């Protein structure tokens, strides 16, 4: 199952501020050369005041909305 824009996803990257948190996919880059093609938007901000981050498809788990 491919991850699409608007999907709810759980973050599996352990070093991420949002590890195990749920966010919404803001965009997906279809280019094969992109290492982190999925941009995810979160409700809360990190230490720098940022609420988006890019992740690889293998670092995400789609959850039921």
Curated annotation (Swiss-Prot):
Location, primary (coarse class): membrane
UniProt xrefs under InterPro entries: Elect_transpt_acc-like_dom_sf (IPR008990), PSI_PsaE (IPR003375)
Topology versus the membrane: Peripheral membrane protein
Entry GO terms, CC: photosystem I reaction center; plasma membrane
Compartments in which it is found: Cell inner membrane
Keyword ATP-binding: no
Pfam family, one: PSI_PsaE
PANTHER family: PHOTOSYSTEM I REACTION CENTER SUBUNIT IV A, CHLOROPLASTIC-RELATED, PHOTOSYSTEM I SUBUNIT IV
Role: Stabilizes the interaction between PsaC and the PSI core, assists the docking of the ferredoxin to PSI and interacts with ferredoxin-NADP oxidoreductase.
Identification of the protein by name: Photosystem I reaction center subunit IV
Organism encoding this protein: Gloeobacter violaceus (strain ATCC 29082 / PCC 7421)
Record gene name: psaE
């Amino acid at each position: 199952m491919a991850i699409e824009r608007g999907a709810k996803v759980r973050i599996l990257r352990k070093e991420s501020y949002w590890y195990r948190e749920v966010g919404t996919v803001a965009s997906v880059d279809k280019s094969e050369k992109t290492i982190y093609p999925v941009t995810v938007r979160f409700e809360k901000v990190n230490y720098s005041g940022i609420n988006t981050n890019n992740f690889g498809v293998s670092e995400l788990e789609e959850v039921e909305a």
